[in-house]
A protein has these predicted regions:
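Bacterial N-terminal signal peptides that target proteins for export
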Residues: 2-16
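Bacterial N-terminal signal peptides
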Residues: 15-26
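Acidic, metal/ion-coordinating pockets
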Residues: 33-347, 392, 397-404, 417, ...
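Feature captures C-terminal
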Residues: 42-47, 57, 65-72, 76, ...
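Short, solvent-exposed loop/turn motifs
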Residues: 196, 385-387, 493, 519
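Acidic, glycine-rich low-complexity/disordered segments
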Residues: 353-374
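Glycine-rich phosphate/diphosphate-binding loops and the adjacent beta-loop-alpha structural elements
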Residues: 370-394
């Protein structure tokens, strides 16, 4: 062999080898072959259907709209869940709290037993506990879980005692001060083929500022992220890699009207909680703010995490399609997706199972709730558009309640009354809802409007303390709602300037405070009425709780409203010029 031929052969071989290397690199870099397909049978599909803030909306009468479309209510939510489950081998229905409490009269008059019965019929599997589950205290929450007759009202159907919830409520971050025990399980594990999936239930840490203190005495509400993170190694020690948090806390965003899948400018507590959560937690199902969103938020390791919220009152269902990998027993985030579905009544047929529950309770409700208590001349609405969406503005509804409470406690010398916006749960609408006649307000409607059964208290406050309360409308940084606008009684006025930046109230100024046209004396003492929730410092109005001196009992807040409507009918919407917003 000549040396020239050998050199040619060697050169040719090198060229062939180089070509093969380049070809292999090109193929490896092509999208079609960037990743080998998963071997058959290694992936498990798990559908999660999620909702939050049901608030006892068994009937559809006042569940509300999505855009212009009437939506929600138990009968239609149940049908939507059944529709979405079709074709899915593995499916769970989960919730993020506030399933009961703050409910319309149809459920609330009966301590939300109709609500739990409807949730059982829908096939709910597991839920976190929200702040409203504590409205009647820990003992009543345990009755709602386990069953039994109400300690005061007894059994509504003697031959059919309340059976409790078929689903499991979870609350990992609520602990007994003395024992450190939780009132309900902290987590729940379900197996799909060979893969265990854990659900951690979380109540918002601020619950002790949102419910009456007497019902939660002796219980601590811990940081959500710290509690969840502490459970991760406990779950992993049991072989669990796929971890979902059901969290009753949320955020805010600014979508277009009717848009339920956006995640635009997401802000609020959920952002900081997401940042603080262990990256081992794969999904967060959230609630509390009554807003829909469908987000992919980066966890602390930079990986995308699904975070959803599904509005309120059964108006939206979040469908989370999880892909589980048998090789890791974990969630394949790159393959998992989420979508929010509207529960539009016109597109659905009521579920007969829920209709049967409604029919069962209707005769009792007709007796208790259909009695007329007064009349109105037009709608008396909450703040925002749609109504009830903004607790940071003055509203006719809030001022009406304050007027009623001032009038009702006048015998105790009351001069000013304040009402928290979250205590007004619906509008009083002029159009008839159930055949009672236009303008007629029934006891059931009054209950739905103001359902918590608080006690009115009248006590002395200095002018300076009153101004401090008004400044506390500007909520602490990180609160779910940056500003909570108190309803104020007629004759009380002031000027207000506030700044809201990136979902937080950053400044507030209260000036020109007057009572019946006379400037408030900062050193003088005035008789103020508030419900016991506010008087105990609820909603971060801490000044109320520090006021010294006696507190005079003014009776039940709902009865104050009912008697006011009966005395002054027809009642017109109070003005919303009691507070002059300067900016």
């Amino acid at each position: 062999m000549s040396s020239t031929f050998a050199r040619v052969r060697r050169s040719t071989a090198l060229l062939v080898a180089l070509f093969m290397v380049l070809a292999t690199m090109a193929l490896a870099g092509s999208p079609a072959d960037a990743k080998k397909p998963d071997p058959p049978g290694q992936l498990v599909q798990l559908q999660l259907l999620a909702f939050n803030d049901y608030h006892g909306h068994v009937k559809d009468t006042d569940a509300g709209n999505i855009g212009e479309d009437p939506s929600g209510g138990g009968e239609y939510l149940s049908t939507k869940l059944k529709e979405l489950r079709q074709g899915n081998k593995y499916t769970l229905t989960v919730a993020a709290g506030d399933l009961i409490g703050g409910s319309p009269a149809f459920s609330g008059l009966f301590h939300d037993e109709p609500s739990v019965e409807s949730l059982n019929a829908m096939g709910l599997d597991v839920s976190s506990v929200g702040n409203h589950e504590f409205d009647e205290g820990v003992t009543e929450l345990l009755r709602m879980q386990d069953g039994g007759c109400h300690p005061l009202d007894g059994c509504y159907f003697p031959d059919e005692p309340y059976a409790g919830a078929d689903f499991q409520w979870l609350s990992a971050n609520v602990v007994n001060e003395a024992t450190g025990e939780t009132p309900l399980p902290p987590y729940w594990i379900e197996r799909f083929e060979s893969i265990d999936v854990a659900f951690i239930g979380m109540t918002l840490e601020a619950t002790d500022t949102l419910v009456a203190a007497v019902g939660i005495e002796g219980w601590d509400f811990l940081d959500e992220a710290e509690t969840a993170n502490a459970l991760v190694p406990i779950l992993k020690a049991q072989g669990v890699e796929a971890i979902i948090v059901l969290l009753h806390e949320g955020g805010s965003q600014t979508p277009a009207p009717g848009e339920i899948n956006a995640c635009e400018g997401i802000s609020g507590p959920i952002v900081a909680i997401n940042d603080a959560l262990d990256p081992e937690i794969d999904v967060m199902v959230t609630g509390h703010t009554h807003l829909p969103y469908n987000c992919l938020l980066e966890d602390a390791s930079g990986q995308p995490r699904i975070v959803t919220s599904s509005y309120s009152y059964g108006r939206v269902v979040s469908e989370i399609d999880l892909v589980l990998d048998k090789r890791t027993d974990d969630v394949r985030r790159d393959l998992s997706t989420a979508q929010n579905h509207a529960v539009v009544r016109a597109e659905l047929t009521p579920d007969p199972a829920i209709t049967k529950i409604i029919d069962k309770w209707t005769p009792l409700f007709d007796v208790a709730g259909s009695t007329p208590v007064g009349t109105i001349t037009e709608n008396i609405n909450r703040g925002g558009a749609p109504t009830g969406s903004d607790r940071g503005v003055e509203s006719p509804a809030g001022n009406l309640v304050a007027d009623a409470q001032l009038w009702s406690t006048s015998a105790n010398g009351a001069q000013i009354a304040f009402m928290n916006p979250g205590g007004v749960r619906s509008d009083l609408t002029y159009a008839q809802s159930d055949g009672e006649g236009d303008g007629v307000v029934t006891f059931g409607e009054a209950f739905t409007f103001q359902p918590f059964g608080n006690t009115l208290l009248t006590f002395g406050m200095t002018g300076a303390e009153i101004v401090s309360v008004l400044e506390e409308q500007c909520q602490p940084a990180g609160s779910s709602r940056p500003f909570l606008h108190l309803g104020v009684s007629e004759g009380f006025t002031y000027d207000l300037a506030k700044t809201i930046e990136t979902g937080n109230c950053t400044s507030v100024s209260v000036t020109n405070v007057q009572l019946d046209g006379v400037p408030l004396d900062m050193n003088a003492v005035y008789a103020v009425t508030a419900n016991n929730f506010l008087a105990d410092g609820g909603d971060n109005f801490g000044t109320f709780a520090t006021v010294a001196g006696p507190r005079l009992d003014g009776g039940n807040d709902l009865l104050a409203l009912v008697n006011y409507l009966g005395t002054f009918s027809p009642v017109s919407p109070p003005s919303t010029d009691r507070v002059n917003e300067l900016n």
